[in-house]
Amino acid sequence: MAKQYDVLFRLLLIGDSGVGKTCLLCRFTDNEFHSSHISTIGVDFKMKTIEVDGIKVRIQIWDTAGQERYQTITKQYYRRAQGIFLVYDISSERSYQHIMKWVSDVDEYAPEGVQKILIGNKADEEQKRQVGREQGQQLAKEYGMDFYETSACTNLNIKESFTRLTELVLQAHRKELDGLRTCASNELALAELEEDEGKTEGPANSSKTCWC
């Protein structure tokens, strides 16, 4: 039976509550948009498989709660992330200003070399804009990140931003991937990366199993 994917990566969505992280996740994984969502409690995740540079990548995308009371829980998930989206709402100057705090959390809790992309979400709400595109571009430049303005409502730059972060993670792990490619006798092949510790972590949804 052919493998369904070659490698599994964990991506993380972080940012203030209400910036649209869950909407981004649902649009990318299910191509669905709901104008109202109950705030995420702790963490949740969804999966999607895409192909990048001939490699089938299984993406496990974790959606973290932005409320302060959940920070102790959500920070535990930083350490196993290969890629992180830092999300703000273009109609909320406050959420933009808080990106500096989120970057500080990433620097403290995420592994060295984790790949990052800055997202200015809700680009469809132009009439409510409080943060200019140039501000987002400048902040991303300061932190050495790629930048996208997105809209889960209109599907603007959703596939592009998720694909780009996956590409960055693949590039960062190129040596491991190339090494695993040469191990033709290894049944796990590229998927070995997901089982480096051989144990599960407890997600918010107990019916799902995480092997990364």
Curated annotation (Swiss-Prot):
Expressed predominantly in neural tissues. A lipid is attached at C210, C212 (S-geranylgeranyl cysteine). InterPro entries: P-loop_NTPase, Rab15, Small_GTP-bd, Small_GTPase, Small_GTPase_Rab. It is a lipid-anchor. One of its GO terms (molecular function) is G protein activity. A motif (Switch 1) lies at residues 31-45. Its EC number is 3.6.5.2. It is found in: Cell membrane. Signal peptide: none annotated. Mg(2+) binds at T22, T40, D63. The small GTPases Rab are key regulators of intracellular membrane trafficking, from the formation of transport vesicles to their fusion with membranes. Rabs cycle between an inactive GDP-bound form and an active GTP-bound form that is able to recruit to membranes different sets of downstream effectors directly responsible for vesicle formation, movement, tethering and fusion. RAB15 may act in concert with RAB3A in regulating aspects of synaptic vesicle membrane flow within the nerve terminal. This is Ras-related protein Rab-15. The gene is Rab15.
